[in-house]
A protein has these predicted regions:
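Secondary-structure capping and domain/repeat boundary segments
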Residues: 1-190
Length: 190
C-alpha cells in the first residue's frame, strides 16, 4: 500500500518570503527504506525543524519512518527573529598613497531581510579626490557589471569592491623644432 506525505511550509505570512523544500517524497510504501528529512530554507528565517503536528510541539522529525504505515503531514517551524547580514565595502584606495576614498554614510553596513521587506537596497558611489568612481563590483577582478542595487531577498553577506580610474589624465605632445639646419633632424629622447 502507498501512503501520502504532505509538506506544509508555513510560509504564507508575511507574504513575499517563500520557503524552499528540498524534500520531494510525496508518497512512500512500507517496503521503502526510511527517508531522511532535510531542512527547508526561507530567506531571512532560521529553520527550526519539521513537526508532525500543526501546533509545532514535541520533537522535530528527522526521519520519515516507513514502518509507521500511515499518511504523513509535516509542518515547518521558523524562527521569525530577523537575521541581519553584513555589507563590506572594499575601497581599494591604498595605491597611490595619499588619495583616501570615502564611503558615503548612505551606504548601509548591514541589512535585514524582514525589515527591508524584500525590496532593493541601493549602493551609493564612493568618493576619492583625483579619481573617477567606476562602480561597485561583487568581485575583486571587477568582472561583470557594476552593482547599483541588490535584493534584500538575497539573504547573504555582501562584499563590494570599488573600481577607480584616474580623473587627471594628461596627454603630453612633443613638438620638435627641426627645420634648420637641413639634414640634422631633432630626436625626442622620451
Amino acid at each position: 500500500k502507498t501512503y501520502t506525505v504532505q509538506w506544509n511550509l508555513n510560509d504564507s505570512a508575511p507574504a513575499g518570503h517563500p520557503a524552499s523544500n528540498p524534500n520531494t517524497a510525496a508518497s512512500y510504501t512500507v517496503l521503502d527504506a526510511d527517508i531522511t528529512v532535510s531542512p527547508a530554507t526561507r530567506p531571512g528565517y532560521t529553520f527550526l525543524g519539521w513537526y508532525d503536528n500543526p501546533g509545532l510541539t514535541g520533537t522535530p522529525v528527522t526521519t520519515l519512518r516507513t514502518m509507521d504505515a500511515e499518511n504523513k503531514s509535516y509542518y515547518a517551524k521558523w524562527d521569525t527573529t530577523p537575521i541581519t547580514y553584513p555589507i563590506t565595502y572594499v575601497l581599494n584606495d591604498s595605491t597611490p598613497a595619499g588619495h583616501p576614498a570615502t564611503n558615503p554614510a548612505a551606504n548601509l553596513m548591514s541589512y535585514t531581510v524582514l525589515t527591508n521587506g524584500g525590496g532593493n537596497i541601493n549602493v551609493v558611489p564612493a568618493l576619492r579626490n583625483g579619481y573617477t568612481f567606476g562602480g561597485w563590483y561583487d568581485n575583486p577582478s571587477f568582472s561583470g557589471s557594476p552593482i547599483n542595487s541588490f535584493s534584500a531577498m538575497d539573504a547573504a553577506p555582501k562584499t563590494f569592491y570599488a573600481k577607480w580610474s584616474s580623473a587627471n589624465s594628461y596627454t603630453v605632445t612633443y613638438t620638435l623644432n627641426d627645420g634648420t639646419p637641413a639634414g640634422h633632424p631633432a630626436t625626442n629622447p622620451n
